């Protein structure tokens, strides 16, 4: 068993005492929760391909529509995406996977699959048992009830449920006018990223919804974007330099609309810290690239 994982003799009682609520979903998994724990259902390859097709279509549609109509399409409307996936599923299944794999969609699926597997491996190796990730427990396989399809799952591991995503915390603080606290959480986020670099890990998908809040800590929720491959890190940093205002790229434009001073301070700190020199200052010496 990897270091940092807790092996329990049986599953936490709350996982089996009632039906687990559907908490959220991503490209590769669906998450269900009890009061203190979450479990995950991995999507089938055909589900992931269907979602990739849908997102490609939505992005094309968003580009030709006026901004006020196109942008909402890309804000992850979960129920609509679910419906579209169900409608797309027969088309995906009818076409052999070998055909899909020869297309750009197949290439995107392979990239997603390899990055997700690599990220999970890196998280198990370097982050398990640390304060950078929620607690993770394993136990003998047990059948649990879940809301919606398929109605039940067999699970053998669970992860500590966080209070909310980092994005949701920032959104709530902005809505209530607590901008001093919002800025403090942004500082914690930047400190969290630097702590990850000290362990030789960089996230190429550092969206605020991929991070959670528990107590006064920021934790990583989705390890799929983790990499220790320096050329990939440099490519990502290069793209970020030309991507515009960091706070807008992270989805905080609407949250900081009335506080351009906070947006400007965050953007300045981000550009200083999340840069080649900034990352190198924290990167472990034994794996640091030649400059």
Q: Which residues are covered by each model-predicted region?
A:
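A short, low-complexity linker immediately N-terminal to eukaryotic Hanks-type protein kinase catalytic domains
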Residues: 4-17
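ATP-binding glycine-rich loop module of kinase domains
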Residues: 19-21, 25-124
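Anionic group-transfer/hydrolysis microenvironments
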Residues: 42, 162, 224
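Feature marks short, surface-exposed loop/turn motifs that line or immediately flank catalytic pockets
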Residues: 45, 165, 227
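Conserved structural core of kinase catalytic domains
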Residues: 80-186
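C-lobe/activation-segment region of protein kinase-like
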Residues: 175-189, 197-204, 213-291
